[in-house]
Each structure stands twice: as structure tokens, then as C-alpha cells.
Design a protein with these regions (language model features):
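N-terminal structured subdomain of primase-like DNA metabolism proteins
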Residues: 1-103
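Phosphate-handling DNA/RNA-contact segment within nucleic-acid enzymes
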Residues: 3, 15, 30, 104-112, ...
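A charged alpha-helical hairpin associated with nucleic-acid processing machineries
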Residues: 5, 206-207, 249-258, 285-301, ...
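Conserved active-site segments centered on acidic
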Residues: 6, 82-137
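A general alpha-helix detector
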Residues: 20, 67-71, 118-122, 134-138, ...
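Short linear loop/turn motifs
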Residues: 33-36, 86-90, 98-105, 149-165, ...
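Short, conserved phosphate-binding/catalytic loop or strand-edge motifs used
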Residues: 55, 89-93, 136-141, 146-162, ...
């Protein structure tokens, strides 16, 4: 439903923003402005201000800001319509009546949430029963006990269409099961069947903690693919969600940091070792929507990737995807694990302390881009060095924020200069005196449109 600007303005006018923010942040008055410690990042001195007159909040440290609608969206994980509805109710503003179509659509969605939740409970029950013994044994082999299974609501999907029978007994129609992504319709005179069978189940929730989908790991050696997710539904789009986000969000807002691992088991291992603000994408490379979800909780999320070539390529893809969205104070950091290790295996062998060392040494985005383009490569000829400069120029050109792009340009210029200055012919005494002063004039200038893409980028 669309809301007119006049209605939205009336809701904001009736909302006491200081009181709203004050429920979560201790505020102190300085003149007509209220100040407090920013809830979006760690700080020791208050740089977060709230102004009722302007009806806005803003942090001078991390740049977060907005109005009452944005506050509820950030702090409670609400969508914009949900934030409008909540504030309107608190402010006593009557919203336009829903059409019958609006009401039917909302009721349908609510019904689907209930169905997915019922499936989650069913899978949990199966894991604890006799049919789930193999799944429990697998969890044990990965160092996870019953408490871990309960904490993450892990489950098991049998291979006998038992979910369909269970939901039918609860008066759930087959059409609704299919719509929720829990069943496959029958084809060619074959009976409908469960979408997941003989798999360890990882429930996926939305940002408010409502169950919306599942990831399933095959337990049979012949299971292909090893992992599958619920298909796209009206509740779930895998490129817009992150595993464990609803639980990780409060911890991330408190600590100002969030970790993105590669898979479900990595997240579970991280959380169990004390890294509560840990999430994972859902079988895809990091998407723009997921990047913005991360930035809503922390200005510099840490991406924890395997330390092999595949992990480095994954980090490079994430870095290139993020370039157009970079802005002052918001970037990515990368923690590359030793070859052959992932967070789950590293924590099992080295504990949380070993993982902390890796996270503490996380590299900045610019450093990772430089590494991928230069590590192990020969730049002994002018043509190869020119090719590197061309590729770095493309990277800078992809950054839309002018100020951030300028800093990347400077950093790459300095790295090129430091890397190649020793290759130059012996300078005269006079040229050595002026070398430093002339760097800005003579150094390569990155950012112009490029004619080609580097082989490294094509390979990624």
C-alpha cells in the first residue's frame, strides 16, 4: 500500500523522536539538541544527535541517520510499511482502510509464515526421533550436541513424504505447501512429494525472526547437490536474506562488527565460539541487497573466506561488487583463513582464539584488490605495468562516491610508485632530489574509462 506524503508527515509530526530513540539510547541535552553514544557503532564520546525540531537523528562518527521511520527499520528490522503502521498506531494516526485485495494478500502471507513455522517444528521433532539418528550422528561428528541443535532449531527431513501428510492433518492445502516451497506438485500422474527429503535442515528466518525457508544438507553420499535451499517464494528470496541475521543483528549493533562466513556450519561454529554477530549468504555469492543488510548493522563487515585460490576469488568478486556502493565510512574487510581451513574446521582445531587472530588481522578492501592484481605476477616490462595501471583505473572508475574514489586513486598511485620505483634506471642527482616532489605530477592517474578488462577480472 502506498502512503501519501501528507500522511507520512503527520505521523512524523506526532512522533516524539527523542522519546522513541531514548528507549534504546541514553540521551543528554545540549541546548536544543540531544546527544548520546551511537547505537550503530562503538564510541567513547557521544557523536550521535537527535533533534525533535528537524525530526531527524544523525551520527557524525559513522554517518547513520534518518527519521523515525528509518529508526524503526534499522533497530527492529521492519520494512517501511511495517514501520509506518507501527508509528501510526503509536501516534494515533488512522491509516487508510485496506482494500479487500490488501487484506487477502496479507492474510495469505501470514498463513504462509504459519505453515513454514509448522514445518520447522516438524523437522525439529524428526531430528530428535528415531528417524533422525543418522542426522544426529552427523552433527556429533561435526562437534554439535543436542543443545546446539536446539539453539539453531536444526531438523531432519525424512524421505517418505511425511511432511505433506503432517501438514494435511493440520488442514494445510497442497497448494499452500507448494506456495511455501515445502512440496513439489505431482507431474505425469506422479503423486506430490516433499521438497526436502533425507536432509539435515537449517531453518532460515527473515530479519524479524519469522521462519520463511530452509536449507537442506544431503546426508547420503549420493545426494546432489549437497545443499539445496527453498525456491523463491513470496516470503523468501535467497539474494535478499542472510542466514542467522535476526539473531546476529542485535550483537552486531552492540559491537559495531559483523562476520560473513560462507556456510551454515561456519556460522554455527562461530556463534558457539562467542562470535554471535555471524551470518552467511544462502548458496550464492554476496549480493548487493545482502551487502546493504550488512551495512545496516556495521560499517565494515568482515568477510571470512577460505584461504585457497577459490576463497581469494570469492573475496575479489565481493570486493568488485561492492565498489559502486562504497561511501565514506562504509567498506569491507577480509579475513582469509589458512589453505584447507574454514571457520568450522579452524575453530575445531584451534578454538575461538585461533579464529580471533584471523579476524583481528583482516585486510582492507583496497589491499585485497591490490593483492589479487599483483601477487605472483611479473611486471618486468613496461607493457605489463601499463596493463596493471589500466586495471586499477577500472577499479577506481567503478566507485561512484567521488571522495572515496579519490582516496583509492591515491593509494593505488602510491602502491604502484613504491612497487616499481626500484626498477627505474639510476636517476641523476638532481632527479633524485625532485623525485618525491614530482610523484603527484608523474605518477599514473587512475579512473579514466578503460578499453579492456584484465585477465584476472575475466577469470573471476
Amino acid at each position: 500500500m502506498r502512503y501519501g506524503s501528507g500522511l507520512l508527515e503527520e505521523i512524523l509530526r506526532r512522533t516524539d523522536l527523542v522519546q522513541l530513540v531514548g528507549r534504546r539510547v541514553k540521551l543528554e541535552r545540549r541546548g536544543r539538541v540531544m546527544w548520546g553514544l551511537c547505537p550503530f557503532h562503538k564510541e567513547k564520546s557521544p557523536s550521535f544527535k537527535v533533534e525533535n525540531e528537524r525530526r531527524t537523528y544523525h551520527c557524525f562518527g559513522c554517518g547513520k541517520g534518518g527519521d523515525a521511520f528509518k529508526w524503526n527499520m534499522e533497530m527492529e528490522g521492519l520494512s517501511f510499511p511495517e514501520s509506518v503502521q507501527k508509528l501510526a498506531g503509536e501516534a494515533g494516526v488512522e491509516l487508510p482502510a485496506w482494500t479487500p485485495e490488501d487484506e487477502a494478500r496479507e492474510q495469505k502471507k501470514k498463513s504462509l509464515y504459519d505453515i513454514v513455522e509448522a514445518a520447522c517444528v516438524f523437522y525439529e521433532t524428526q531430528l530428535r526421533g528415531q528417524v533422525g539418528s543418522e542426522a544426529r550422528q552427523y552433527l556429533k561428528s561435526r562437534g554439535l550436541d543436542d543443545a546446539a541443535a536446539k539453539q539453531f532449531r536444526l531438523g531432519y527431513s525424512p524421505s517418505n513424504n511425511s511432511l505433506i501428510a503432517h501438514l494435511k492433518a493440520k488442514d494445510v492445502s497442497l497448494d499452500d505447501m507448494v506456495t511455501a516451497g515445502l512440496a513439489r506438485p505431482g507431474e505425469d500422474n506422479r503423486a506430490p512429494r516433499d521438497f526436502f527429503y533425507d536432509r539435515l535442515m537449517f531453518p532460515i528466518s527473515d530479519s524479524r525472526g519469522r521462519m520463511i525457508a530452509f536449507g537442506g544438507r544431503g546426508l547420503s553420499p549420493d545426494a546432489k547437490p549437497k545443499y539445496i535451499n527453498t525456491g523463491e517464494t513470496s516470503l523468501f528470496s535467497k539474494g535478499q536474506q542472510l542466514y542467522n541475521f535476526a539473531t546476529a543483528r542485535p550483537a552486531a549493533l552492540k559491537d559495531g562488527s559483523i562476520i560473513l562466513a560462507e556456510g551454515y556450519m561456519d556460522v554455527i561454529a562461530l556463534v558457539r565460539s562467542g562470535f554471535e554477530a555471524s551470518v552467511a549468504p544462502l548458496g550464492t555469492a554476496l549480493t548487493e541487497d545482502q551487502l546493504h543488510l550488512l551495512w545496516r548493522t556495521a560499517p565494515e563487515p568482515i568477510l571470512a573466506f577460505d584461504g585457497d585460490d577459490a576463497g581469494l576469488r570469492a573475496g575479489y568478486r565481493a570486493a568488485r561488487m561492492a565498489l559502486p556502493h562504497l561511501k565514506a565510512g562504509y567498506s569491507l574487510r577480509f579475513a582469509f583463513l589458512p589453505p584447507g581451513e574454514d571457520p568450522d574446521t579452524l575453530i575445531r582445531t584451534s578454538g575461538g582464539g585461533g579464529m580471533k587472530k584471523i579476524l583481528d588481522s583482516a585486510e582492507g578492501l583496497a589491499r585485497v584488490l591490490w593483492r589479487v592484481e599483483t601477487d605472483g605476477k611479473d611486471f618486468s616490462t613496461p607493457e605489463r605495468r601499463a596493463g596493471l595501471e589500466r586495471t586499477l583505473g577500472e577499479i577506481v572508475s567503478a566507485i561512484r562516491d567521488g571522495k572515496v574514489a579519490d582516496y583509492y586513486r591515491r593509494e593505488f598511485e602510491e602502491r604502484v610508485f613504491e612497487s616499481f620505483k626500484r626498477r627505474a634506471p639510476r636517476a641523476t642527482q638532481q632527479s633524485r632530489k625532485t623525485e618525491g616532489r614530482n610523484f603527484r605530477r608523474d605518477a599514473p592517474r587512475f579512473g579514466a574509462p578503460l578499453e579492456s578488462i584484465s585477465p584476472a577480472l575475466k577469470a573471476s
